[in-house]
Amino acid sequence: MTVSNKDGSEKAKIKVATYNYYFALTYNNLRTRQQQYSRYGLDPKQYNLDVDFDKKLSKQTTKNNDNETVTWEEYIHDEVIESIESTYTYYLAAKAANNGKDPEITADQKKELKETLQQYRESAHKYGYTLSGYLVKAMGKGVTESLFTQEATRSYIADNYKSELSDKSNEKEYTTKDYDNYKKNHEDELLSVDVRLFECSSEDDAKAFKKALAKDASNFTALCQKYASDKFYKTAYEDAGYSTEYGVTKENLKNKGYAIATADDKDKKSFPGLDWLYSSKRKAGDSYQYSTTVVYVLSPASIQNRKTVNVRHILIAPETSDNKTAAKDATDKQWSAAYKKATKILDEFNAGDKKEKSFAQLAKNNTSDTGSKDNGGLYENVVPGQMVNSFSAWSFDSSRKAGDTAIVKSDYGYHIMYFVGNGDLTTWQYAAKKALSSGDSTSKTEKLEKDYSIKVNWFGSRYFEKDVDIDN
């Protein structure tokens, strides 16, 4: 088996042991997925996972991606070949870009690989094997410690190079002409609205909400509290931000699952609720009830020139009795304790120099948001619809200025907010840049993948580890 580019300048011979390594990974991943789905009460058959691992793979059939009937042995074999071709395509390209030498993997990747091997080493010792002996027993002939290390390292190199190509596309600067051309061709996708919006528990409630709604929507917040589904939301909706959506596109509303953004029952390509909301006939003050959604228009559909925002936050989640309890299901006492902690942290910040750097340090020390902890709670180029409503409504308030702080509540806890400032691009330009860079990245990867291919040697394939229980 060989992976190479068209002119043969970059190629790698794939040994049987490498095939066995990938077969074991694919086999075990499939088995793990099946177990996970079953654990959550999902029928494996509905997800093409109805393989019986106690029987020969060659005696069971399934459907492949082309809806053809194949044996499970053939199905997994095809998956393995695709994985090898993809990994070695990017590995070889990375090596070529590094003057023919293997690029270094990151320190974290080296650590992860070392820890993985140590886990296998402990299992090997437990059953009286050397590490290589255990790996061969578990993954197939030839999968020794050195082979495992080699293939894992090459996989890291491939992933890193793929990320590098994507990063280069993301860093590309586009011209005003590029943005305007994108805008011209994607106007409908870029249209956004500012609205008050509430999702009722039933259509009858939505009709009653709409009927009681004042013409100026002055009672919108009160009605949200009245029709909220439980005690938590009745309190949460005291904040108008909970029911405010600034600069949301059709896609934003679809992703959030609002009833107004669902397709027509008979025509799945038609979205009556969105057609009404994004119509050129809409004006500020219009209100509408569609299914269980009630919406009040603050600003009608347009391609807004609102800038992206950069914000920091410190999430203080209620401390529940166990990790399985969602924050919104915490007790009043636990929520109260979280608010006191948030207030104390904000007071500490206000008593200091009130500099962004100080806020960032407090975030590192206190936030429950693991996604932003290491960079001091920072989120850059935030766009409407990206964050929860209350977070987003505060961040995109037109009165917001650098250095502003506040505490806002969400389903996840209390967010101590710090407004850093606006980004360089408008929200529609940022959306255009992401789409353009994604297109450029896709073009690069497609070109690269077309240049490389895999050839399987029939004779060598007779020695692949297939149709066996690799765990025994």
Q: Model regions: which residues?
A:
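N-terminal targeting/tethering segments
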Residues: 1-147
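Alpha-helix N-cap and coil->helix boundary residues
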Residues: 104-108, 112, 174, 357-358, ...
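Hydrophobic aliphatic residue packing
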Residues: 1-3, 314-316, 345
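Solvent-exposed, polar/charged alpha-helical surfaces in well-ordered, non-transmembrane soluble domains
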Residues: 17, 21-24, 74, 78-82, ...
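Peptidyl-prolyl cis-trans isomerase
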Residues: 208-266, 340-389, 420-421
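Ser/Thr-centric signal marking residues that sit
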Residues: 26, 367, 410
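PPIase-associated folding chaperone regions across multiple families
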Residues: 134-211, 250-340, 384-472
